[in-house]
């Protein structure tokens, strides 16, 4: 099966900023995202699970140029004021149209018909 290179951008942040972060991801060119609640420990120590709120892991698969824009925005406007981390992974996807906001959406099956 033919795959295509993309970037997986993962942001872990406090749940209070989830809505603002996901809005920015879309404005920066992400076609969508997935949010998962979580907890853990890091350089700022563990976040007690009995406190209100939680952490969220926000993931989006995007072209390399969009990943770069997202990281630049996080670096310039988020890292200094919010407790969050971000990282990028190389991934391979089957249907690039699902992940590229610049490509027009196609009806189900159209990706197959285009081959």
Task: Please state what every model-predicted region is.
Residues 1-115:
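Positively charged, small/polar-rich N-terminal and surface patches that mediate targeting and assembly
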């Amino acid at each position: 099966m033919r795959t295509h290179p993309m970037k997986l951008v993962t942001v872990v942040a406090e749940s209070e900023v989830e809505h603002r972060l996901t809005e920015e991801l879309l404005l920066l060119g992400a076609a969508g995202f997935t949010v998962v609640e979580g907890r853990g420990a890091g350089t700022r120590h563990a976040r007690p699970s009995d406190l209100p709120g939680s952490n969220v892991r926000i993931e989006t698969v995007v072209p390399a140029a969009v990943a770069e824009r997202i990281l630049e925005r996080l670096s310039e406007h988020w890292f200094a004021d919010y407790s969050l981390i971000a990282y990028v992974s190389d991934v391979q996807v089957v249907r690039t149209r699902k992940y590229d906001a610049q490509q027009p959406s196609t009806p189900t099956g159209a990706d197959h018909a285009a081959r």
